Amino acid sequence: MTMTPREIVAELDKFIIGQNDAKRAVAIALRNRWRRMQLGEELRREIFPKNILMIGPTGVGKTEIARRLSDLAGAPFLKIEATKFTEVGYVGRDVESIIRDLVDVAVKMTREKAIRQVKSLAEEAAEERVLDALIPPARGGFQGEPTAEEKPTEKKESATRQLFRKKLRNGELDDKEIEVEVSAHPSFEIMGPPGMEEMVSQLQGIMSSMSSRRSKSRRLKVKDALRILGEEEAAKLVDEDQIKSTALASVEQNGIVFIDEIDKIVKREGAVGADVSREGVQRDLLPLVEGSTVFTKYGMVKTDHILFIASGAFHIAKPSDLVPELQGRFPIRVELKALTADDFVRILTEPKASLTEQYTELLKTENFGLSFTKDGIKRLAEIAYQVNDRSENIGARRLHTIMERLLEEVSFEATDKQGESITIDADYVNKQLKKLAEDEDLSRYIL
C-alpha cells in the first residue's frame, strides 16, 4: 500500500458520500501497514495492528467502505458475515475457516501475479503448439544427412511457418478448428456437509493432481486453443512452492479481514438459553484477533499481524455488550452518521457510476434517452428521506427501492419507444410516487 492516507480518502470519496471519520480511520490503518513494513524485523514484530470497529445504522456506507477497500488494499482481503459462523463443535463453519479463506485469496492473488510475469513466455509457447497443430512436421525420410534437394524444402517449410505465424498474430486464423492435446481436468464435483470444506478441498486437490498428468485430444477453434494452451504453459512456468510461501507471508504481514454484522452475534441483555451463533462465536473469534496459529492446507498461519475491521448497526445491542476481551481488541471506534436528504441528493449525482448514471446508461442501450433535472433529484431524495423517517430507516438502500418504483414504467416501455427520451423532473416524481409516499401503509410495503 503505497497510497497516502489523503489519497486513500480521496479514492473512497469517489464512491462514498460523507462518513469522513470512518474513511480517515481505515486510511490510517492501511498506511500503518506500509509504515510497519519499513521498520527493522525486531521492531516490526512488536507493532500490532489497531483493529477498527465501525458503528452506524444500516445503509450508511459501512459495507461499501469494505468493498472499495478491497480494491485499494493490494493485499489479501476478505469480507465475511459474522452470522455465517457457529461455535466449534456445532454443525456449521467455525471461525478458523476465515483464515483458511484468506489464505486461499492470497494464493489466488499471488498466482495471478506470477502468471502475469510469465505471460509473454507462456503465449510464445502456446503459439508454437498451435503452429505445430496447424503445420504438422514433415514426415521423416531416410536416416542421415539431408540431400541438396531437401535443404530448400526445409527453408520453404520455415517460410510457411512464418506466414502462418503472421496470420495467427493478425487474428486471421481465429475461427479455424484444430486438434490439440490439452490436460484432462476432472469433470466432477465433490459435495460435502457444512463445516467440512477443508476436507472436500483436499480431496479435490488429490483428484486434480492425479488427473493433471493425463492429457486428451480436443478439437478447438484457434483463439480458444491459444487461451487454454497459454494457461497450461503459464502453469508450467510458475513455481507453486514459491507462490505458497509468498502467499502465507503476505497473509501474516498484510492480511485484512472485514467482519460485517458483528452486532448480530452479540447476546442481548435479558436473553436466556444457549445461542450457538452468538457469544460462543465471539469467544472463538477472540484467539484469531488476539493472535494465534491456524493450520491451513498451505501451512501454518500466525494471525498476530492481521488487521481486523468489524462493523455493525448496533440498533438493538450496544458495543459494550460484546465480550470484554473482544471489546479491548478493537481499540479504534468510529461512528458513522445517519444520512440526510442532502446526502441523498449527493449520492444520486456525485459518486462514480451513481444511480442516475446507471439507469441512464442502461436505457441508452435501447436507444432511449433518460435525464434528470435538479428539482427531480431533490424531490426523489426528499421522498426517500421521508419514507426512511416514517418507517424503517434503511439508509441509502431506500434510493434503490424508490428508483426502481419510479422508473418501472419507463424501463418496461423503453424497448417500444426507441429514439424517444424522457426527463425526470419534480412533477414526474410526484405523479409516480407522491400517493405511495404519503400513504404510510402503502409506503411501508411498497417503498
Swiss-Prot record:
Subcellular location: Cytoplasm
InterPro entries (UniProt xref): AAA+_ATPase, ATP-dep_Clp_protease_ClpX, ATPase_AAA_core, Clp_ATPase_C, HslU, P-loop_NTPase
Gene3D superfamilies per UniProt: 1.10.8.60, P-loop containing nucleotide triphosphate hydrolases
Residues involved in ATP binding: 17, 59-64, 260, 325, 397
The entry's keywords: ATP-binding, Chaperone, Cytoplasm, Nucleotide-binding, Stress response
Stretch list, region Disordered: 136-160
GO BP of this protein: protein unfolding; proteolysis involved in protein catabolic process
Molecular functions (GO terms): ATP binding; ATP hydrolysis activity; peptidase activity; proteasome-activating activity
Comp. bias (Basic and acidic residues): 148-159
CC terms in the record's Gene Ontology section: HslUV protease complex
Its biological purpose: ATPase subunit of a proteasome-like degradation complex; this subunit has chaperone activity. The binding of ATP and its subsequent hydrolysis by HslU are essential for unfolding of protein substrates subsequently hydrolyzed by HslV. HslU recognizes the N-terminal part of its protein substrates and unfolds these before they are guided to HslV for hydrolysis.
Subunit structure, as described in the record: A double ring-shaped homohexamer of HslV is capped on each side by a ring-shaped HslU homohexamer. The assembly of the HslU/HslV complex is dependent on binding of ATP.
Family: Belongs to the ClpX chaperone family. HslU subfamily.
Protein name: ATP-dependent protease ATPase subunit HslU
Source organism per UniProt: Coxiella burnetii (strain RSA 331 / Henzerling II)
